[in-house]
Design a protein with these regions (language model features):
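A short, N-terminal "cap"/entry segment at the start of jelly-roll beta-barrel domains
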Residues: 12-36
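Short, solvent-exposed loop/turn elements at beta->coil junctions and helix N-caps
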Residues: 28-32, 127-132
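Active-site-adjacent beta-strand/loop module that shapes the phosphate/pyrophosphate-binding cleft
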Residues: 44-49, 132-152
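Nudix hydrolase/Nudix homology domain
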Residues: 2-21, 125, 133-136, 160-230
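Acidic, metal-coordinating catalytic segment for phosphate/diphosphate chemistry
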Residues: 28-67, 71-72
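Conserved hydrophobic/aromatic beta-strand scaffold that supports enzyme active sites
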Residues: 40-44, 67, 77, 142-144, ...
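A short coil-to-beta-strand element that immediately follows conserved catalytic motifs
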Residues: 25, 119-126
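Conserved Nudix-box catalytic region and its N-terminal flanking loop in Nudix hydrolases
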Residues: 4-10, 65-110, 152, 159-161, ...
């Protein structure tokens, strides 16, 4: 049996490990491009060991996504065109946190109405993640929405890529199988499906409240890495 040597620098108990915000000194920050949805920045940052490096990244507003689960353990999926990858992707409800003074939970509820014409009486935090932390400040919170019903007025008519979005209900187990087979590759679909499976396997006891702390999001906003909301 192979024996691995543990670096003593990281020999603290595994249960204590977590991702933590840091405040490295930003020596210089430049806006390379101001886009319609997000911006591109170039920053010089001190690493704390005498090194200064320059990094470019997308300054993103952040986003929310909703894994809507009905009483038959089926997940709502919407098919949408995503131009940067040139693909039609099956994904949960999602949207940008681009409305000033709107909480993530309120934004998620708004997106659920706008994209699916649904409201939910039960909300939990499903999972938090950063989509591409090496090149983007985007943070995403996924909610689990249950006890679903039709929104007053039904499903609104969207525009652009959001016009006439096909919608299906897929059993969670089938969704997980498709994720593992590489048939679904959208990050919210992959992350949401696997997180929902893990929570279900624990009897949903591991779900966090809808108002759970979101330290990564708070740090990105407070440190000025997020694109300003309007």
């Amino acid at each position: 049996m192979t024996s691995f040597v543990i670096d003593p620098t990281w020999a603290e108990p595994l249960h204590s490990l977590r991702d933590t915000p840091v405040n490295n000194v930003v020596v210089d920050s430049r806006e390379i491009h101001a886009g319609v949805v997000w911006d591109l920045r170039s920053e010089s940052v001190e690493l704390g060991d005498g090194q200064t490096v320059r990094r470019e990244f997308v300054a993103h507003t952040g986003a929310v996504s909703v894994l809507a689960l009905d009483d038959d353990d089926r997940v709502l999926l919407i098919r949408q065109y995503r131009h940067p990858v040139g693909m039609m992707l099956w994904e949960p409800v999602a949207g940008l946190l681009d409305v000033a003074d709107e909480s993530p939970r309120a934004g998620a509820a708004r997106e659920l109405v706008e994209e699916a014409g649904l409201v939910a009486d039960e909300w939990h935090t499903l999972v938090d993640f950063e989509t591409s932390p090496g090149g983007s400040s985007e943070t995403i919170r996924m909610y689990l929405a249950r006890q679903l019903s039709a929104a007053p007025g039904g499903r609104p008519v969207g525009s652009g890529e959001e016009r006439d979005l096909p919608l299906v209900w897929m059993p969670l187990d089938q969704l997980v199988d498709k994720v593992l087979a590489g048939e679904f590759t959208c990050p919210t679909t992959v992350t949401g499906a696997l997180a929902a499976l893990a929570h279900r396997n624990q009897g949903w006891r591991s779900l966090r409240p809808e108002t759970a702390a979101w330290p990564a999001r708070n740090h990105v906003v407070d440190s000025g890495r997020s694109r300003q909301q309007v």
